[in-house]
Amino acid sequence: MTEQHPTVSIIIPHWNGIETLSECIDSLLKSTFESYEVIVADNASSDGSQAWIKESHPHIKLVENDRNYGYAGGCNRGADKASGEFLVFLNNDTIQKSDWLHYLVELMEKDNTIAAAQPKILNYYQKKMFDYAGGSGGYMDMFCFPYARGRLFLEQEEDQGQYNDAKKCFWASGTAIMVRKELFVEAGKFDEIFFAHMEEIDLCWRLQAMGHHVWVEPQSIVYHKNAVSLPMHTHRKYYLNHRNSLLMLLSNFSVPVAFYVGFIRIMLEFIAVGYAVIKLDWNHVTGILRSLIWILFHPVTILK
């Protein structure tokens, strides 16, 4: 780890979970790429995380936020303290192969049209399986439903080398995304309205609208636990996923396209509500309905 003029600034948004963060940092410190710094953006943890970082890892930059700003806000505040040419936003529930940074930096340095890139992301617990949150590069269908190589709906594929080609994609996963700092700032950073979920897709959309590209480099490998900070199947997770998907659609398309696609998407949301009712999944039902109410009452925010 380099203390002065690092090439890469690794920013870890964090909210509680010392054991999880400790494993992530221990893995980072084994990196064979040496020109990097680590910044932990702590979102007002209540478990003593700040004191633990100061005592156990005094060379790590600690950003002590006054409240929980979510992934988007935590990352933005961490980026403000970064010195590197490249920023890596990294989930705290990850471990990494020792050469992961080398491959990402090599990709970015050989092609300056690439604004952002992600590694191959595999499941922490089943290391031959792709992870749900990003797999080997993310894409978007015509109705703005995100999907990824290595994931079909809710099912993850086994990694058999079928997606080992470095290639252009639509979005890079916020689990581990490298972005050129200059372009991150120029694009307006993460939109903090998102709080958590899909803010990285929104960022990648804006970077591409600026004329840049997003890639996946599968030689770089990260393992992800998934849903540690915000568990699956909770009301809040459903709400943020549905709201942010609609917010992203309405914010990035032109008005005529947003109106057309948005109308179809809202119809699909109501179908999803009906399906959730049949399954008696009330967290899902209330999460979708709350997201639609938010969209209805925030037109100025969406069209800003």
What is the meaning of each model-derived region?
Residues 94-145:
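Conserved donor NDP-sugar-binding/catalytic core segment of glycosyltransferases
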Residues 35-44, 61-65:
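Short beta-strand/loop segment that forms part of the nucleotide-sugar
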Residues 210-303:
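Active-site-adjacent helix/loop segment of glycosyltransferases
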Residues 26-35:
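Short, acidic, metal-binding catalytic loop of nucleotide-sugar glycosyltransferases
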Residues 87:
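Short aromatic/hydrophobic "clamp" motif used to bind/position activated sugar donors
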Residues 164-221:
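A short, conserved alpha-helix in the catalytic core of glycosyltransferases
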Residues 138, 142-148, 153-182, 201-203, ...:
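A recurrent flexible, glycine/aromatic-enriched loop bordering the glycosyltransferase active site
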Residues 65-82, 92, 103:
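Glycine-rich, basic loop-to-helix element that forms the pyrophosphate-binding segment
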